UniProtKB/Swiss-Prot annotation:
Organism the protein comes from: Actinobacillus pleuropneumoniae serotype 5b (strain L20)
Protein name according to UniProt: Lysine--tRNA ligase
Subunit structure: Homodimer.
Family note: Belongs to the class-II aminoacyl-tRNA synthetase family.
Binding site for Mg(2+) 2: 418
Gene Ontology biological process terms, A to Z: lysyl-tRNA aminoacylation
A Pfam family reported for this protein in Swiss-Prot or TrEMBL: tRNA_anti-codon
Residues that hold Mg(2+) 1 according to the record: 411, 418
Length: 500
């Protein structure tokens, strides 16, 4: 018999034993009651009483009611020690036969297994080793666990188990619980930041007839009642800018986007973004906003502006570097000159030398962008704003007044990864229509990620969009940074996984 077969046999035997215990408990009453009300949490009890001496604690006679999942147990005849875990942490219980009503220890406590959820009432005391413990006078099984907790290898280090059965990961892995607490703080901190700056939070369609706002491949579905193909949105941008046209001068949406593309340590097809738009502002204002936001998040979440991430330490306390795409290529491109990047033929030659496959639809801007991604992107470790992107790859961004070949756009890079994208918005309806037409031509030439033309959005621009700047920030990638998580799957509770 193989090791796997032995494990399955052991699991089946364990589950059978637990079901037999559950059957006996049912004979005594409902083994899944809903009447227990706790008044204390493990973390707060430790914070308040860990430093109190045992005698002083005894004199205070502190009564508590706690509940949680059994993580450890030590049975010593007529008494047992259990460690239970609630949302805040763990605390030890001392359950002795003589401290309970007659028959409770033998008939009920003896049925407790690892993974069961229990509620107890009792008095705080310190053990001989000084551990804060609840001496239980009342106990109640709240939920019988029919499956045993995973062992250490399965529960804490096996990635498949962690991602597919996140509930087991959260039970077993304190670091995972911390990661998702940090993610929650990132989301709430961002929302509060924009609300305090008088932004209005809005919701725009997830199902769209025309997917727009980003260069990406969408998911397609069909609306039966309307008999029309629809798309899961790739970005809320065009709807949010319609709202600015309508007079909402500061809007944001914190929600999901969907892109039918690859899965990697940086990409999940379903992801969360904050996208915001501010009238009477430009892309410089948004870069300032972004610095302020990330600095505040670092302090509020970690208590410092220096954030460790893998082999790096990011410094959010210093002004972020600001560099143009062309200057970044020259800086890191090992001999590439600005004159090279102004020539389509020379840029194509450089790109091919770097092993880049040139697409038929590419102009100079796309080639320059591909060169940047190859030679410079991974070099932008400390928080850096990359600016002045070619107009060809920025169909929704305003052209720069001094050099119309580039746009008033920036991308935020941290650790060599793009975290955000923003720009002064294109509010010239005629220019926007022409750029949409160029995107349609690229799509017809085989570019799956080229944008669709949104005629209604052009009509909205014809009514007048005030000078506006907008930005999108990836929540998942920010959570990765603040939680020091190497993969996007580590910060998404239920990431996309290939079917078994």
């Amino acid at each position: 018999m193989s090791e796997v077969e032995h494990q399955e046999l052991d699991l089946n035997g364990e589950m059978l034993a637990r079901r037999e215990k559950l059957a006996k408990l049912r004979e005594q009453g409902n083994p899944f009651p809903n009447t227990f009300r706790r008044d204390a949490y493990a973390e707060k009890l430790h914070a308040q009483y860990d430093e109190v001496e045992g005698e002083a604690l005894k004199e205070q006679d502190i009564q508590v009611k706690v509940a949680g999942r059994i993580m450890l147990k030590r049975v010593m005849g007529k008494a047992s020690f259990f460690t239970i875990q609630d949302v805040s942490g763990q605390i030890q219980l001392y359950v002795a036969r003589d401290n309970l009503a007659e028959g409770v220890y033998a008939d009920k406590v003896s049925m407790w297994d690892l993974g069961d959820i229990v509620g107890v009432a009792g008095t705080l005391f310190k053990t001989k080793t000084g551990e804060l413990t609840v001496r239980c006078s009342e106990v109640e099984l709240l939920t019988k666990s029919l499956r045993p907790l995973p062992n250490k290898v399965q529960g804490l280090t096996d990635q498949e188990t962690r991602y597919r059965q996140r509930y087991l990961d959260l039970i077993s892995n304190e670091e995972s619980r911390r990661t998702f607490m940090i993610r929650s703080k990132v989301v709430s901190g961002i929302r509060q930041f924009f609300l305090e700056k008088d932004f209005i939070e809005v919701e725009t369609p997830m199902l769209q007839v025309i997917p727009g706002g980003a260069a990406a491949k969408p998911f397609i579905t069909h609306h039966n009642a309307l008999d029309v193909d629809m798309y899961l949105r790739i970005a809320p941008e065009l709807y949010l800018k319609r709202l600015v046209v309508g007079g909402f001068e500061r809007v944001f949406e914190l929600n999901r986007n969907f892109r039918n593309e690859g899965v990697s340590v940086r990409h999940n097809p379903e992801f969360t973004m904050i996208e915001y738009y501010q009238a009477y502002a430009d892309y410089h204002d948004l870069m300032d906003n972004t610095e302020e936001l990330l600095r505040k998040l670092a302090i509020d979440i970690l208590g410092t502006t220096t954030v460790p991430y893998g082999e790096y330490v990011f410094d959010f306390g210093k002004p972020f570097e600001r560099i143009t795409m062309h200057d970044a290529i020259v800086k890191y491109g090992n001999g590439i000159t600005r004159e090279d990047l102004d020539s389509f033929e020379k840029s194509v030659e450089i790109a091919k030398g770097l092993g880049i496959e040139i697409q038929k639809s590419w102009g100079l801007g796309s080639v320059v962008n591909a060169i940047f991604e190859e030679v410079a992107e991974h070099q932008l470790i400390q928080p850096t704003f990359l600016m002045a992107h070619p107009a060809e790859i920025s169909p929704l961004a305003r052209r720069n007044d001094e050099n119309p070949e580039v746009t008033d756009r920036f991308e935020l890079f941290i650790g060599g990864r793009e975290i955000g994208n923003g720009f002064s918005e294109l509010n010239d309806a005629e220019d926007q229509a022409e750029r949409f037409d160029a995107q349609v031509a690229a799509k017809d030439a085989g570019d799956d990620e080229a944008m669709f033309k949104d005629e209604d959005f052009v009509v909205a621009l014809e009514h007048g969009l005030p000078p506006t700047a907008g930005e999108g920030l990836g929540i998942d990638r920010l959570a990765m940074i603040f939680a020091n998580a190497p993969s996007i799957r580590d910060v998404i509770l239920f990431p996309a996984m290939r079917q078994k």
